[in-house]
């Protein structure tokens, strides 16, 4: 959520920045709501002043032995009017809050202009795509051996965009997740956290999935108001809800492996085959909570930490800076990591690392105590995929495939795979 002070004091600047990301803010509606809010606030103050004055007059009348009943009746009438105006003010505040919740974050000044992923800017590449003396196969074909990648069984259980993994592929999937967790906890200083996979609606409001992306969420039927997590970012960031963290305890660096559940409502016809786009997938998520002045340094750090997974697996990739028009709703700046897939002869997204500045922190009131002032201030929140496990498995299968259809085990993964060389 944007700072309402910025909206009130520098509306034109906000409108222009939002326009960079293709969002047209309705400034007329904002001004109307703001005027109504001010009018209601003044009316409440006026009623309160009159009531206080009458209360003093009643006290004086009683001290003089005069009948205070007419004045008390007037106070009672004022109280009724005050309650009505307070209810009106709450209605206006709710409309104002709903208006704010629909506004995305402002892009950082360093974010390049652009409308879509076609305008994203490549920052760097690492590794060279492998050369094959045979035509490389798609991961779905490679997975057909021993029926280890079984979409038919998954469809029988759950429908399209699900998968059943068996045997060595299931083990490789588990091994990748364990490898990522060990790297981030042992070498990158993250605390591993196990979190619920069902969260309250307010958690999704806190991180920005709601209200805009409701159709992309899986909501549990019944009266419990639970949602399945679309990303580990949601429970991890919300751990700081209504917290005040002391400065020496920062930065907070949390990592969790969770399933992610997404309806893919806007993805009809995209990646219908294989494991690239699924309703359920595993992801190792990195989250940092930092002091505001350190957040862009933290963004570079979290990106390099996600890159390290790909480097240790020797998977070719590139880093792309998202243009303003391709930014996620809560992000001020984002880097995507894209891994090389031989069967598609192109790079595909495998990680997204974002600085949300104080956008999420304002929604959940996640704060730190500034030792210079002694007062609580909003934190900056960052998140990054470290990595999407299923897509990493796809990349390993395709980049390490052999002519006979077997997959060579990356050196970094051998100890997690029982020391075997191929699967």
Curated annotation (Swiss-Prot):
What are the GO cellular component annotations? cytoplasm
Q: Describe which pathway this protein belongs to, using the record's wording.
A: Aminoacyl-tRNA biosynthesis; selenocysteinyl-tRNA(Sec) biosynthesis; L-seryl-tRNA(Sec) from L-serine and tRNA(Sec): step 1/1
Q: Which PROSITE patterns match?
A: AA_TRNA_LIGASE_II (PS50862)
Query: What InterPro entries is this protein classified in?
Result: aa-tRNA-synt_IIb (IPR002314), aa-tRNA-synth_II (IPR006195), aa-tRNA-synth_II/BPL/LPL (IPR045864), Ser-tRNA-ligase_type_1 (IPR002317), Ser-tRNA-synth_1_N (IPR015866), SerRS_1_N_sf (IPR042103), SerRS_core (IPR033729), tRNA-bd_arm (IPR010978)
**Residues the record lists as binding L-serine:** 231-233, 285, 385
Please provide the record's keywords in A-Z order.
Aminoacyl-tRNA synthetase, ATP-binding, Cytoplasm, Ligase, Nucleotide-binding, Protein biosynthesis
Gene Ontology MF annotations:
ATP binding; serine-tRNA ligase activity
Q: EC number(s) of the enzyme? A: 6.1.1.11
Renumbered to this chain, region (Disordered) spans 107-130
Q: What is its main location?
A: cytoplasm
* Record bears the keyword Cell division: no
> One of this protein's Pfam families, by short name?
Seryl_tRNA_N
Which GO BP terms sit in this record? selenocysteine biosynthetic process; seryl-tRNA aminoacylation
Q: What class of enzyme is it?
A: ligase
**Where is the sequence biased in composition, kind Basic and acidic residues?**
110-124
Q: Which residues bind ATP?
A: 262-264, 349-352
Compartments, record wording: Cytoplasm
NCBIfam families, from UniProt? serS
What does the record say about domains? Consists of two distinct domains, a catalytic core and a N-terminal extension that is involved in tRNA binding.
Quaternary structure annotation from Swiss-Prot or TrEMBL: Homodimer. The tRNA molecule binds across the dimer.
What the record says about family reads: Belongs to the class-II aminoacyl-tRNA synthetase family. Type-1 seryl-tRNA synthetase subfamily.
Q: What does it do?
A: Catalyzes the attachment of serine to tRNA(Ser). Is also able to aminoacylate tRNA(Sec) with serine, to form the misacylated tRNA L-seryl-tRNA(Sec), which will be further converted into selenocysteinyl-tRNA(Sec).
Q: What is this protein called?
A: Serine--tRNA ligase
Source organism per entry reads: Coxiella burnetii (strain Dugway 5J108-111)
Its lineage reads: Bacteria, Pseudomonadati, Pseudomonadota, Gammaproteobacteria, Legionellales
Instruction: State the gene name recorded for this protein.
Output: serS
């Amino acid at each position: 959520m944007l700072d309402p002070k910025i909206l009130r004091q520098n509306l034109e600047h906000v409108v222009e920045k939002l326009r960079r990301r293709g969002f047209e803010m309705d400034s007329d509606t904002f001004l109307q709501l703001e005027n109504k809010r001010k009018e209601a606030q003044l009316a409440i103050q006026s009623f309160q002043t009159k009531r206080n004055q009458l209360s003093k007059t009643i006290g004086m009348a009683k001290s003089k032995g005069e009948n205070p009943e007419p004045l008390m009746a007037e106070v009672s009438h004022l109280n009724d009017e005050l309650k009505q105006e307070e209810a009106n003010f709450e209605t206006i505040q709710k409309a104002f809050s709903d208006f704010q919740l629909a506004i995305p974050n402002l892009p950082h000044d360093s974010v390049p202009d652009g409308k879509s992923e076609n305008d994203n800017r490549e920052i760097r590449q690492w590794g060279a795509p492998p050369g094959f003396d045979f035509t490389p196969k798609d991961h779905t074909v490679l997975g057909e051996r021993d029926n280890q990648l079984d979409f038919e069984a998954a469809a029988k259980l759950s429908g399209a965009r699900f998968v059943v993994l068996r045997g060595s592929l299931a083990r490789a999937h588990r091994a990748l997740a364990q490898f990522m967790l060990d790297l981030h906890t042992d070498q990158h200083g993250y605390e591993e956290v196990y979190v619920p996979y069902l969260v309250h609606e307010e958690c999704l409001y806190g991180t920005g999935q709601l209200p805009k992306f409701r159709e992309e969420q899986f909501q549990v039927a019944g009266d419990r108001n639970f949602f399945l997590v679309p990303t580990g970012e949601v429970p991890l960031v919300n751990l700081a809800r209504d917290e005040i963290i002391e400065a020496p305890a920062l930065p907070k660096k949390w990592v969790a492996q969770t399933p992610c559940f997404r309806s893919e409502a806007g993805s009809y016809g995209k990646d219908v085959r294989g494991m690239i786009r699924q309703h359920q997938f595993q992801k190792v998520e990195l989250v940092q909570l930092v002091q505001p002045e350190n957040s862009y340094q933290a963004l570079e750090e979290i990106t390099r930490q996600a890159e390290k997974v790909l480097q240790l697996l020797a998977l070719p990739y590139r880093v792309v800076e998202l243009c303003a028009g391709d930014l996620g709703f809560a992000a001020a700046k984002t880097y995507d990591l894209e891994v090389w897939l031989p069967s598609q002869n192109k790079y595909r997204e495998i990680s997204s690392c974002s600085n949300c500045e104080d956008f999420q922190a304002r929604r959940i009131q996640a704060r730190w105590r500034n030792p210079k002032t002694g007062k609580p201030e909003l934190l900056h929140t960052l998140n990054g995929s470290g990595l999407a496990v299923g897509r990493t498995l796809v990349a390993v299968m395709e980049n390490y495939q052999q002519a006979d259809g077997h997959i060579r085990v990356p050196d970094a993964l051998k100890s997690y795979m029982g020391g075997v060389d191929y699967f």
